[in-house]
């Protein structure tokens, strides 16, 4: 008898079609070296934008975008709020664990194991990358575009000072949107480009609303892609059973 109720052996049988909704044998599309090179390329591109593109682009947006367009993109920017995604993912994770423990039959075409793994990947990607973004925001302390247009300030302030409007780099809304898009794209590859398009609209809203510079949103999107693909094999892989256990049992063999 299985002594741990929150393991795959307690799950109800599911069809092959439902099990395929989560790619249990997910593998990164690139090697570790390729990811490092892509990260370096992103850092160089962001640096180039900060030197030569960010400010001219922000000035052009300020002069060219109408108030109606600005207000429309404010609504789009709401899709970058991480709170609702965390709440939904947490609810699905709890349902997945309970369904596994009690051997429920899932009324939808998805196993409870897939539900638990997918929702945990969402939570972990938002949490891990969100922490990286927070540390960068506090340490870099980049002035937001608002400070340039009000006081002519373009650059960085004192690290970890928590000064208002010195937390532009990178964009947390863009990170949340791309983190969700990357995870959903991994779980539902056929819809990958739809999710990424929605995330790109959120990133664009941060530029149009003059909340961030181009390098802020570029870096946030890159972090989301990297974190999501690094975590996916360790959460979705069939060889890793910890996602199917309650959090207080993650470290138990």
Which residue ranges define each predicted feature?
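Alpha-helical transmembrane segments of integral membrane proteins
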Residues: 75, 86-87, 118-121, 190-197, ...
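N-terminal transmembrane-helix/juxtamembrane module of multi-pass inner/ER membrane proteins
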Residues: 2-93, 138-154, 160, 252-253
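Membrane-embedded catalytic cores of phosphoryl/pyrophosphoryl-handling enzymes
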Residues: 23-31, 98-99, 152-253
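Alpha-helical membrane-inserting segments
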Residues: 54, 92, 132, 136, ...
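Interfacial segments of alpha-helical transmembrane regions
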Residues: 95-96, 102-135
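Membrane-interfacial segments
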Residues: 56, 61, 96-107, 139-144, ...
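Lipid-exposed faces of alpha-helical membrane segments in multi-pass integral membrane proteins
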Residues: 41-45, 83, 87-94, 124, ...
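Residue-level signature of transmembrane alpha-helical entry/exit and packing/kink sites
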Residues: 32-39, 114-122, 217
